[in-house]
Amino acid sequence: MDIPALRERAETYFGGLAPTHDWHHVERVVENAETLAGRTDQTVDEDVLLGAAWLHDIGRKRESDGEIADHAEWGAAEARRILETQGVDPATVDAVAHCIRAHRFSNDVEPESREAKLLSDADNLDAIGAVGLARTFAYAGEHGRTLHDPALPPEVDDSPAGETSFNHVHKKLLRIRDRMYTDAGRALAADRHAFLETFVEQFEGEVAGER
């Protein structure tokens, strides 16, 4: 598998995307994946992991533009086509496609392979901690989402993703730590989760005029 060529090809799918899912997000996920792979004592097929990491969000722009419903499903199919043109063997193509299908937080596709679990963890790590908070509030700016509504605390917000940015932190970000699949992922997530908890405490204190 020609990873540098895949990287170049993948980048062509990201023109005009907003910061929450731009090319820099992909680069961070790749860095996370490499870190996690280096901290596991099990054998990892790095071609599968890195190929999937570079390609995992190639369907994002189409989904954002309303052309497709599920960027993970479309991206897996598109990745198959790309890899087949490289002459990659069918088993590896299948493995990469599974990683891409299973990486999405809201999908019901369970990651089965070690590489799929590592990619899922790598992607989820970019949704928590300082970067996760930055992306949450960038999304608020992109879509006009309310920062915080004191009349709608998280415990009475019925939206699965949270109606406000602060509620999104509670509804999604603070739950990601418990969705990690690997020991290495859980270790990194613990530190980022602690940062989120510190932020929530500080935010609530400032909103109440107590800090």
Regions found by a protein language model. Give the residues of each.
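Short, well-structured alpha-helical segments
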Residues: 23-30, 46, 50, 93-101, ...
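Alpha-helical phosphate/pyrophosphate-handling elements in metalloenzyme active cores
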Residues: 17-49, 71-90
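His-Asp-centered metal-binding catalytic motifs of divalent-metal-dependent phosphohydrolases/nucleases
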Residues: 46-65, 71, 75, 79, ...
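Divalent metal-dependent phosphate-bond-processing catalytic cores, especially two-metal-ion Mg2+/Mn2+ enzymes
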Residues: 17-23, 31-42, 55, 108-211
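Terminal disorder- and signal-encoded targeting elements
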Residues: 1-8, 211
